[in-house]
Regions:
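Short conserved AdoMet
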Residues: 41, 239, 321
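Helix-coil boundary and N-terminal low-complexity module in membrane systems
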Residues: 73-80, 102, 135
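Conserved phosphate- and dinucleotide-binding cores of soluble alpha/beta proteins
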Residues: 2-20, 24-38, 52-68, 86-298, ...
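Short glycine-rich or small-residue beta-strand-to-loop segments that form or flank ligand, phosphate
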Residues: 45-50, 78-82, 107-110
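Hydrophobic/aromatic residues located in beta-strands of well-ordered beta-sheets
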Residues: 77-79, 244, 326, 351, ...
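Glycine-rich phosphate/ribose-binding loops and adjacent secondary-structure elements
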Residues: 37, 65, 75, 303-305, ...
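Short glycine-rich phosphate-binding loop at a beta-alpha junction
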Residues: 46-48, 325-329
Length: 549
């Protein structure tokens, strides 16, 4: 038998089969996945650690589905997903359990999303057809709920989400009629202030993922792109007398894991199941640069192609100063670190993303939510505490639509709901952020030419993103004004400031006619300041713009 010491746990040339063989002979917590999921009772509240495909315990979710198909159990479970499980590119995640009779209620920070060309995920069909009570709860609040349940406190009291769709004065997180009929949040007065109160939902089962387990169930995360919330979810379940199932890539003997590397101690884990083929993240089996095992040269990162979205990202980047810490979201905003790279500032700003990476270069595309060359990986629950308390200097986020109050929607598209994942950590991040830069298109579908002299509008768009009232309030402009938050919206035509009298364009892109291209298309919802400036033409050049931080 192979004896695995600390010295050879880091030798990744050892065949996985040897780890598995060792586990089968000596480790009582390692069981077939079918045996582990057989312990999940009808009506259980099941919490899942995942962020799309990143850290997704997909084999366990698939086994729950298989058991249900074979036996009709477990029935009517509630599923909790602080961030979201699965994607539309081969890791089914929550879609494994999106079945009538199996899933009766789901609370998630986000849901699988994809392009309009992709098939609608099954969980979205259930939501739209009102076959499951579905809620979109900010990711940070969901982690808070686990912490409060673990400590046997009555629930979460928070200002996060006030005057947004999270607020019961609006939708109260409900995504359909079944959810609206069973509220999970209420308003409360305490200490002379208004709060949102989320009563505890105590989890019975935790399904988490790591890279390696030893015979006692101690878990390490050396191949993972983030820790996510596995520890907090396991504690919440253990403290409520429940069951913790950990999916790992391999198993090793006791004593071979360095204590400082163990992120979830074995006394919290009941069963370990092995999936040697678990993907690190979407479309990625394993990349050591994502897990921080190697550092990439800055020259190996691509810079954005020349185009309108890059111009928007460049203007957003001009808000930064050297030494800042900034939060980063999906969409056009995700290009901002690459703009800094092209300008010669690869590490002048510390980036913090909700999955837990701090510093380095946030990745884009399928690897969004991960970073290479990170300074640190922070568990997601702690990252969200940092976000909710606005410890960072600036946040770069995107928008689907903006209304006259400055409200932003990123969480709902009624016609094609699966094109957006929901709110994720957006509400937590923006609740008290001191400085917010939203980036997006002023109009959808306009024909635009980009020249070194300016933006040329050749044909108007199908519709403006500046509307009377957003479909879903993910960010409250009214509350931002009350709190004195500094908010701007960067578009291909102008920079808009949220002011006391509404939306005011304070900077105009070269080539843009303020009346014809801003006031007119927005039907007066965006006004132009008398002293509005013209943005520098360097933003438009197909070359570095000479940014100075």
């Amino acid at each position: 038998m192979l004896k695995l010491e600390r010295s050879n746990i880091n030798n990744w040339n050892v065949p996985i089969s040897m780890f598995v063989e060792c586990a089968e002979e000596r480790m009582t917590k390692v069981v077939p996945v079918s045996d582990a999921v057989a312990q999940i009772a009808d009506g259980a509240v099941v919490t899942v650690s995942s962020s799309s495909a990143l850290g997704c315990p997909d084999a366990v979710l698939a086994a729950i589905s298989a058991r249900f198909e074979a036996t009709g159990h477990p029935q009517n479970i509630t599923s909790l997903h602080p961030i979201g499980a699965g994607d539309v590119y081969g890791v089914k995640g929550i879609d494994h359990i999106a079945k009538d009779g199996l899933l009766s209620r789901v609370l998630a920070g986000s849901y699988p999303s994809g392009p309009s060309s992709a098939e609608m995920p099954q969980i979205w069909r259930m939501i739209v057809e009102d076959r499951v009570a579905a809620y979109n709860v900010p990711s940070g609040i969901m982690f808070d709920m686990h912490r409060e349940a673990a400590a046997k406190r009555p629930g979460v009291l928070t200002e996060v989400g006030l005057d947004t769709f999270v607020d019961p004065n609006r939708q109260g997180c409900a995504m359909n009629e079944r959810a609206a009929a069973a509220p999970i949040v209420e308003r409360a007065e305490f200490g002379g202030k208004t709060w949102l109160y989320f009563p505890n939902i105590s989890p019975d089962v935790a399904i988490i993922r790591a890279t390696t387990a030893d015979e006692r169930g101690n878990l390490t995360y050396e191949h993972e792109g983030a820790y996510l919330g596995g520890l907090e979810q396991a504690i919440a379940v253990r403290n409520n007398g429940g069951l913790v199932i950990a999916q790992v890539k391999r198993v090793t003997a006791n004593g071979s894991l360095r204590p400082h590397d163990v992120r979830v101690p074995g006394h919290l884990v009941d069963y370990v199941v092995i999936d040697p083929d678990q993907k690190q993240t979407t479309e990625t089996l394993y990349n050591p640069a994502i897990s921080g095992e190697i550092m990439r040269p800055w020259s190996s990162f691509s810079v954005p192609e020349h185009g309108i979205e890059k111009v928007i990202a460049r203007r957003a980047a001009m808000e930064l100063k050297r030494g800042m810490t900034a939060n980063l979201g999906f969409g056009i905003s995700a290009m901002v670190p690459r703009v800094l790279l092209e300008e010669g500032y690869p590490d002048a700003v510390t980036w913090a993303i909700e999955q837990g990476a701090v510093g380095g270069m946030p990745l884009t595309g399928f690897a969004f939510g991960c970073a290479s060359n990170a300074d640190a990986f922070v568990p997601s629950p702690q990252q969200f505490i940092y976000f909710q308390g606005a410890g960072f200097d600036m946040s770069f986020l995107s928008f689907l639509e903006v209304d006259v109050e400055g409200n932003v929607n990123v969480s709902k598209l009624g016609k094609k709901p699966y094109l957006t994942a929901g709110c994720g950590g957006f509400v937590d991040i923006t609740a008290k952020a001191r400085n917010i830069v939203f980036s997006g298109w002023f109009e959808a579908g306009a024909k635009i030419a980009l020249t070194e002299d300016g933006i040329k509008i050749k044909a108007p768009g199908k519709f403006t993103k500046m509307v009377d009232e957003v479909e879903h309030v993910t960010f409250s402009g009214r509350r931002a004004r009350e709190q004195g938050q500094n908010v701007i919206y960067v578009t291909e035509r102008c920079v808009i400031a949220l002011q006391g009298n509404g939306l005011v364009a304070t900077e105009i892109m070269p080539g843009i006619d303020p009346q014809a291209h801003i006031v007119g298309p927005s039907q007066g919802r965006v006004q132009v300041a008398e002293n509005a400036k013209i943005m520098p033409k360097a933003l438009l050049a197909d070359a570095p713009m000479g940014l100075v931080l």
